[in-house]
Every structure is written in structure tokens, then in C-alpha cells.
């Protein structure tokens, strides 16, 4: 976890891997001292009126530093009702069995697609570690030692109009806002997920007019490239 004490992760993405289930997990390393800075963790170090005045850091001392995760499993779960269905849990557990295999393929495919896009005349730039330079690539090389994953972005020449045309011309790749699917997915955020933002807000979020986000799936790269090629030819 690279010294992270708690991790919140969407299992809907690569763990599920097939776009069939919705869920998330909280992972507590069990190593963080939740009592060290009580003023920064008041919910864990002061009486909880919703749970009989319990002070979570004191109540769990015999069990170790698990105040956060225990509170999450009692009061937060109780108040929010975030209870995963048994079938979804089964799908995620099943997905974990092939996660390592799929991630290797996602990463390998994405490397090929990133190289293809970076050499295409209709593409201004590609956002993917292997074709980038500087700080971002250095960090990726340090931490992503088993591959750079399947998520990438690219800036298409011609701005918003070209971005929309590209998306609408895709035949095999799905136009979906999800990521981490076995299928390749593409979306033009400026005209869909972030369309309510002003131009200034879009730019501050790193979303340029021709930006397209891709989640590269497990199809053969020849098929992915063929679909991108015919779509790019129509802008």
C-alpha cells in the first residue's frame, strides 16, 4: 500500500473486471495509531452519542488499532446502508482469481495502443506513462513495476467536434463512462460526464476540448487499432 494506512477502492472496476457488479471496499492496514492525534480524529476519540457514548479508540484497545475500520463496519454501515449483495460479492471474489492475469493483458494492450496513438497524425498527445517524459513517467517507473495499467487519455486534433465525431464513429469499442472492463471503453468527458462545467472549470480539471479517455480492454490489439483507425478517419 506504499505506506497508506487506509485504502478506499472501487471493486466495480478491475477487480470485477466485466462491468457486471457495483461495489467498493475499505482496507485498513491495522498499523495506524488513531489515538496519536485525537484532535484530528474526533469521531474516533470522543464519545459517540449514536452508539451509547462509546469512544472507539478505547473500546477496541484489546483488539489493536482497528478503531477506524470497526466504526466503519458499525455506525457508518448502519447509517449509510452500503451493504453489498451476496451475488456481487461472489462476482468480485471470482474476479480476484484472474485479476493478475487480466492486468498483465490490460497493460500489454495499452502499451501497444499508446504507441499507435502517439504516432497517429490526428492525435496531438497521448497521456500514458510509457510515451511520456518527466516527473509523471519517473513516478510510474518507480511504482508501476508490473505495468502501467489499461487507463489512458489522448488529445485529438480538432477539439470538441473531433472528439465527439471519434466517439460516435466507434463500432467495437464501447461508449461507456466505466473503466476497468474486459471490453475497451471510450468517452469524451467534455461533452458527457463533465458537460455541465464551464470552459475554465474544464481546463482546471485537466479536460481539454479534444480530450478522450480510454480504458483498454482484453480484445486483440489488432481489433482495437482497426476500430480506432476507422473512427479517426471520419473526423
For the regions a language model picked out, list residue spans one by one:
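Active-site C-terminal subdomain of aminotransferase-like
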Residues: 9, 15-151, 155-183
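PLP-dependent enzyme catalytic core of the Aspartate aminotransferase-like
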Residues: 102, 161, 168, 184-235
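Short, Asp-centered acidic motifs that coordinate Mg2+ and/or phosphate
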Residues: 6
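Short, small-residue-biased leader/transition segments that mark boundaries at the very start
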Residues: 1-2
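Thr-Gly-centered strand-to-loop micro-motif
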Residues: 9-10, 215
